[in-house]
């Protein structure tokens, strides 16, 4: 009996170390950032079982076997669709401004199409205005409505949008609604899904959370896009979820969420439609390729229309493209660079690009919320402040609520707006979308919004920052070390 016990003990110890060695080798063999690899190895060696379980659950990008197969299967038809779209040469811009040209060339080579011209674009900063405009557009819809959101929170004006969507479905409009399972948990626990399905709306719970499959697919991989397409002609995207700020997270102690949305008319809606069709096929297996744009209803020609590129990220989409786009934008800046984000945990490359821009004389400003709904990210972001301030970057702490807008403005002409936070999760993991806009008029509108944010912010004083308590510095460095994992 003693011999058997000894043998089992030795086998258990051997298996334990083989497991650690195997996971270590897997981490080292994966092409990943050194800080991320080092953080994972430290966790595994300090808390082996916890670290191994955590790594197997969220350490690698697992879309899941079924979705991965769908993603591979959809790309031949998607590539053909994009190639056919090139025949509509009149919708593509032949040239860009000097500040936007490098980014637009990058997107064209990575995604296969040039920037789309001839669009009407409206910047919207008030949730009531967004929802009222959306309700009007839904009421006027003639053919189809496609919607995807990370969060749909019942209550307030969100319910009015739901009612208008159901009314559209009842009068024969083909309505599709895709919501993230984790972000919209309150919605899926409410009566709304059944009501919508009974009205004729196709409702899909994207990336459904299932703890029984935690090792088969990353549960923290989320559908973070916010997009609405109506009749393949009108489109919305931006940072706003389908929530009424007066009813959303009122007990979080951060105030109302402050967002920005863009409403578009024109052929750019088709480019956004192919992104939605890819997401829909990955989730449902059904193919819904959008029709080509109607050449007869372009609202503006090149002389007055906004030129836009859609940049999509997530498993199955061009790898690292949004990260590359942000780096390109930062290095293209010659006069000023303004960035707004609720969550700031940049990669080393992005941090270096921002600091380098400031050090070569570019006026660089970053606007962040003073109070954050994520304690971990809030502390981790503070760990970057010293380096940013030393480089000459201005850090504004917004005091008018939780600033949730994600935007970048370069030299007043190149704008980036969408769903991407400046953190690891948005840059490397989630399904995201960003609009790259080459237009001085839109740049002026975005600059006015950012100036309003700055007027409601407090500029961080570098001298006072250096006098912060020691325990603050310790907490910042602790969370900074784990920032590659956030």
Swiss-Prot record:
Residues annotated as transmembrane: 3-23, 38-58
Protein name: Cardiolipin synthase A
Function summary: Catalyzes the reversible phosphatidyl group transfer from one phosphatidylglycerol molecule to another to form cardiolipin (CL) (diphosphatidylglycerol) and glycerol.
GO molecular function: cardiolipin synthase activity
Keyword vocabulary terms for this entry: Cell inner membrane, Cell membrane, Lipid biosynthesis, Lipid metabolism, Membrane, Phospholipid biosynthesis, Phospholipid metabolism, Repeat, Transferase, Transmembrane, Transmembrane helix
SMART domains: PLDc (SM00155)
Lineage: Bacteria, Pseudomonadati, Pseudomonadota, Gammaproteobacteria, Enterobacterales
UniProt cross-references to CDD domains, sorted A to Z: PLDc_EcCLS_like_1, PLDc_EcCLS_like_2
The protein's Enzyme Commission number: 2.7.8.-
